[in-house]
Curated annotation (Swiss-Prot):
Belongs to the prokaryotic/mitochondrial release factor family. The gene is prfB. GO terms for molecular function: translation release factor activity, codon specific. Pfam families: PCRF (PF03462), RF-1 (PF00472). This is Peptide chain release factor 2. Methylated by PrmC. Methylation increases the termination efficiency of RF2. PROSITE patterns: RF_PROK_I.
Length: 364
């Protein structure tokens, strides 16, 4: 690669980095970190444990951005030094290394550029994914299991931690429902647009005639909000059921009624937890999920009111369908963004970024 081409590419990276610092408020974030450090240096403040916890959490979130930008700046400076060396020594091997490094830095910048999309209040939070089998019988339950695996695979590729909170196994195969927790940087921001109905069209492996079947599964994403969020729940509005856990779990499964199901009677919202052996801990977790769901419901209600004001009307049942997975034709199409993928297995193995990124860019 010619030196002037490499120089132009480096200059473009430098400009993108400058733009990045501007719209991600690098200076303001750096100043805020110094202010937090100053506060934390006071001995008196450590008496306020919750306040200190919140300060440290804010600092950690700010440092995610600052450290990434600092790392990019460092990489660019090192690359310029190597370029000068390559020009001086006329070493083509160094030039090749620089061209590879340019690609890596461009990818890092692109990742940070995407952080502009995470502007919602709880985008930085961990989140829960509820998977619920819809119409389609055994196929729908099998489809729900496939979707669950897809999101677990995607989370693993992102470096997110996952935990299965509750799982209700299907009558023959698959699952009727499941809740998983996804923990990581901007987990809710990444996943929030995945809420909706996912439609599967395929020749059913459970049909002896191998006829085409359509089945549905709903996905609901909601943030793992802090307990300080003011969501008041009247105890009389809750029905709490205990039952024996099902599925994998070792020798204690089905011996004690440790699993907890909570129903919020005014809204019929249900949360379940069975991953702890302690009924008390399961109840505590289910209550936390209930608060998160009720909060997300309030946010959605506000958005729906705004949509009505804007007269943005569409058929509810069709509008809730966000993506079609047509396995026989090897085609997956997002009905909102128009994004299509033809490597079906890759998507089912967690290759979702093209769908997610476009939905965030469009502000869905």
């Amino acid at each position: 690669m010619e030196i002037n081409i490499i120089t132009n590419k480096i200059n473009k990276l430098i400009q993108r980095k400058k733009d990045l610092k501007r719209y991600l408020d690098y200076v303001a974030k750096s100043t805020r970190i110094l202010e937090i450090d100053l506060e934390l240096s006071s001995t008196e403040i450590w008496k306020k444990k919750e306040y200190v916890h919140n300060l440290n959490k804010e600092k950690n979130l700010l440092n995610i951005i600052i450290n990434k930008i600092n790392n990019i700046e460092k990489n660019i400076k090192e690359m310029i030094i190597f370029l000068d060396l390559a020009i001086e020594t006329k070493d083509n091997a160094i030039i090749q290394e620089i061209s590879e490094e340019i690609k890596k830095i461009a990818e890092k910048i692109q990742e940070l550029e995407f952080y502009r999309m995470f502007s919602n209040q709880h985008d930085h939070c961990n989140c829960y994914i509820d998977v619920q089998a819809g119409s389609g019988g055994v196929d729908a339950q099998d489809w729900s299991k496939i979707l669950l695996r897809m999101y677990l695979k995607w989370s693993d590729k992102k470096g997110f931690k996952t935990e299965i909170i509750e799982e209700s196994t299907g009558e023959i195969v698959g699952i009727k429902s499941s809740t998983i927790k996804v923990s990581g940087q901007y987990a809710f921001g990444w996943l929030r647009t995945e809420t909706g109905i996912h439609r599967l069209i395929r020749k059913s492996p459970f049909d002896s005639g191998k006829r085409r079947h359509t089945s549905f599964s709903s996905i609901f994403i909601y943030p793992d909000i802090e307990d300080k969020i003011n969501i008041e729940i009247n105890p009389s509005d809750l029905r709490i059921d205990v039952y024996r856990a099902s599925g994998a779990g070792g020798q204690h499964v089905n011996r004690t009624e440790s699993a907890v199901r909570i129903t919020h009677l005014p809204t019929n919202i249900v949360t379940q937890c069975q991953n702890n052996r302690s009924q008390h801990k399961n109840k505590e977790q289910a209550i936390k999920q209930m608060k998160s769901k009720l909060y997300e419901m309030k946010i959605k209600e506000k958005k729906e009111k705004q949509k009505k004001i804007e007269k943005n009307k569409s058929d509810i049942s069709w509008g809730n369908q966000i993506r079609s997975y047509i396995l026989d034709n090897s085609k997956i199409k997002d009905l909102r963004t128009g994004v299509e993928k033809y490597n079906v297995q890759s998507v089912l193995d967690g290759d979702l970024d093209d769908f997610i990124e476009q939905s965030l860019i469009m502000g869905l």
